Structures are given as C-alpha cells and as structure tokens.
C-alpha cells in the first residue's frame, strides 16, 4: 500500500472554510408603564423610536418590540398593574456614556427617557411616564 502524504492547503482556502462569526450587538430596554387607575388605557410604540447618544447624537434604531403594539395598532393596558414591554435597538457607539430613549412622533405624547447611563451589558430597565 502506498503512503498517503498530508495535502497542503493554502491559507486563503483555510480562511474561506472557517465559519464566519459576526458579533451582533444590540441594546435591550425593558420599559415599565406605571399602573393606570382606570380601564381603557391604550399604549403603542412607533418605529420612529430611537436611542440617541447624548454626545455624538448617534441614533440607534428600533429593530424589535415585545408585548407592545407597533403603530397604528394599540395594546390595552390592564388597570392597577404595571405594564412591562421590551424594545430592542441596534448598537450604540463604543464610547457612548449616556443616551436618551425618544419616540419621535407627529403628535403629542411620545415617550422620552433622558440621560440613561450606559452599562457594560447594554440591558436597561426604565420607567415610562
């Protein structure tokens, strides 16, 4: 039986064969809408909701929402119970230290939470008022 030698594979081919892992960074914001004291309260979020870096003005876009309807639909908020929903945004710049959560809408009543301090996990809990 003939000896089989190990084939040489050029480095460019090896690189192409390696799995491509691209780290996707996202910012998760858990929002609390305080308990209303009456029935019939409605809530929704617009796609024009951003995280805005307080220094650079960079805008991170809303990419996902949980437990809240997206405009033009509404979500009913139960009375006497805090209502929680989650928003997921594209990443913030590395050097961002604080940011605002702002819903930019063509009417009154858009959400705004100012000066949220950046943390290492990029997971936040805020109160919407």
Language-model regions, residue ranges each:
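Low-complexity, acidic Ser/Thr/Pro/Gly-rich terminal tails and inter-domain linkers that flank the onset
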Residues: 1-24, 55-68
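Short, well-ordered beta-strand segments enriched in hydrophobic/aromatic residues
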Residues: 25-36
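Short edge-strand/loop segments of extracellular domains
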Residues: 49-55, 103-110
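Short, solvent-exposed, Trp/other aromatic-anchored flexible loops in extracytoplasmic proteins
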Residues: 64-106
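The feature marks short-to-medium sequence segments in extracytoplasmic or secretory-pathway proteins
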Residues: 36, 41-74, 78, 128
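Acidic/polar low-complexity flexible segments
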Residues: 110-129
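Solvent-exposed, conformationally flexible loop/turn segments
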Residues: 24, 78-80, 119-121
């Amino acid at each position: 039986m003939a000896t089989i030698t190990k084939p040489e594979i050029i480095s460019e081919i090896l690189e192409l064969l390696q799995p491509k892992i691209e780290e996707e960074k996202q910012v998760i914001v858990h929002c609390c809408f305080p308990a209303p004291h009456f029935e019939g309260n409605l809530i929704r979020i617009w796609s024009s909701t951003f995280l805005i870096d307080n220094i650079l003005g960079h805008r991170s876009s809303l990419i996902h929402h949980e437990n809240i309807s997206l405009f033009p639909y509404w979500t009913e908020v139960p009375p006497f119970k805090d209502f929680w929903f989650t928003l997921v945004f594209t990443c913030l710049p590395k050097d961002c230290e604080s940011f605002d959560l702002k819903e930019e809408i063509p009417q009154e009543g858009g959400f705004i939470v100012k000066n949220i301090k950046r943390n290492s996990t990029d997971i936040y809990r805020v109160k919407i008022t």
